């Protein structure tokens, strides 16, 4: 991601998206209520029947929208941002408009920038990003494709083999199955991890290597869902491969919190967190990416910094973040047990 311009007084940063990882960072930086300004396209409404029968012409317009929803689409290197138009052509004001962001898109992000958003932006605009991996968890019936980002796991979609079940086809072959997987992943230029039960994983690994894909790990698992990815991340081979990634750190700190909870030195909930922060008794504050944007989240982060508490922001796009979200989005590990 490239920073083209900024106006700190207005909270406006002009960015250019350069690769898929930038889209992941952007998804984590922006939130509902922020404003995005970019060029998008609208269709010209034609009046005559003959004109309506033709494909409508699309013209570029520049709009600013107030963000309501942000989403990736399966197997597409695009981020779709939806919201109401606050600035643009007069007939678009107040209407819903989507802005599609992909490689080479330039856009303005206008928001109240807290320290964590700024830190994430700084990391995104550094020349070298943390490693990203493509993971395929498969058996003989289906293959689930994931991207392991520094901040979590993104499921891209599912490819069915057609061997059995509702997607069964009489023309099934292993080669056609592997070719369908290759066709789905060829747009991604990341090192590949292949995971799953049985022999399908070994067959796919050999198939991809013959076609010059970089397969960096093959691992056994009884699962083909996102849980298989976490099994790999927690394994010794997985730790060696992605030990520096955010997802690995999320696993480590959440596991430490759950252990501390069993020992009586773990706490959760915003009020409990606030109480022990004010006492200076909290060693680690764990907060989800959903909560760190909230007013309460910003207050607790500021308090944690003032007393020297270590801060960990975990992504709700992975299981570890979802665990903390079930504890209210806020969790902590005490420096010492406090007498009540």
Curated annotation (Swiss-Prot):
Domain of life of the source: Archaea
One Gene Ontology term, aspect cellular component: cytoplasm
Keywords: Cytoplasm, Endonuclease, Hydrolase, Metal-binding, Nuclease
Cofactor(s) of this protein: a divalent metal cation
InterPro entries assigned to the protein according to its UniProt record, in alphabetical order: eFR1_2_sf (IPR042226), eRF1_1_Pelota (IPR005140), eRF1_3 (IPR005142), Pelota/DOM34_N (IPR038069), Pelota_arc (IPR023521), Ribosomal_eL30-like_sf (IPR029064), Transl-rel_pelota (IPR004405)
GO molecular function: endonuclease activity; metal ion binding
GO biological process, one term: nuclear-transcribed mRNA catabolic process, non-stop decay
Domain notes per entry: The N-terminal domain has the RNA-binding Sm fold. It harbors the endoribonuclease activity.
Family: Belongs to the eukaryotic release factor 1 family. Pelota subfamily.
Protein name: Protein pelota homolog
Species the sequence originates in: Thermoplasma volcanium (strain ATCC 51530 / DSM 4299 / JCM 9571 / NBRC 15438 / GSS1)
The encoding gene: pelA
């Amino acid at each position: 991601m490239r920073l083209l311009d900024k106006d700190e007084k207005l909270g406006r940063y002009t960015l250019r998206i350069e690769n898929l990882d930038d889209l992941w960072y952007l998804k984590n930086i922006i939130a509902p209520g922020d404003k995005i300004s970019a060029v998008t396209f609208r269709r010209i409404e034609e009046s005559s029947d003959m004109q309506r029968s033709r494909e409508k012409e699309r013209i570029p317009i520049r709009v600013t929208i107030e963000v309501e929803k942000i989403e990736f689409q399966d197997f597409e290197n695009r981020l779709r941002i939806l919201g109401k138009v606050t600035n643009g052509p007069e007939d678009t004001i107040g209407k819903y408009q989507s802005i599609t962001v992909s490689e080479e898109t330039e856009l303005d992000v206008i928001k109240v920038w807290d320290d964590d958003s700024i830190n994430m932006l700084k990391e995104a605009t550094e020349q070298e990003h943390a490693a990203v991996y493509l993971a395929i968890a498969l058996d003989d019936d289906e293959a689930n494709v994931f991207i392991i980002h520094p901040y979590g796991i993104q499921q891209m979609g599912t490819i069915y083999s057609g061997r059995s079940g509702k997607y069964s086809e009489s023309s099934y072959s292993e080669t056609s199955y592997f070719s369908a997987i290759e066709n789905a992943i060829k747009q991604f230029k990341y090192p590949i991890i292949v995971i799953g039960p049985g022999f399908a994983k070994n067959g796919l690994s050999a198939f991809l290597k013959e076609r010059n894909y970089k397969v960096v790990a093959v691992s056994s698992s009884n699962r083909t869902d996102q849980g298989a990815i976490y099994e790999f991340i927690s394994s010794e081979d997985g730790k060696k491969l992605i030990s520096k990634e955010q997802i690995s750190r999320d696993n480590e700190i959440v596991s430490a919190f759950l252990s501390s909870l069993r020992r009586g030195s773990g706490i959760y909930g915003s009020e409990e967190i606030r109480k022990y922060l004010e006492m200076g008794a909290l060693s680690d504050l764990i907060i989800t990416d959903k909560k760190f944007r909230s007013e309460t989240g910003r207050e607790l982060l500021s308090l944690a910094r003032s007393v020297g508490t270590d801060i960990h922001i975990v992504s709700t796009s992975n299981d570890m973040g979802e665990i903390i979200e079930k504890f209210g989005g806020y969790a902590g590990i005490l420096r010492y047990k406090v007498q009540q």
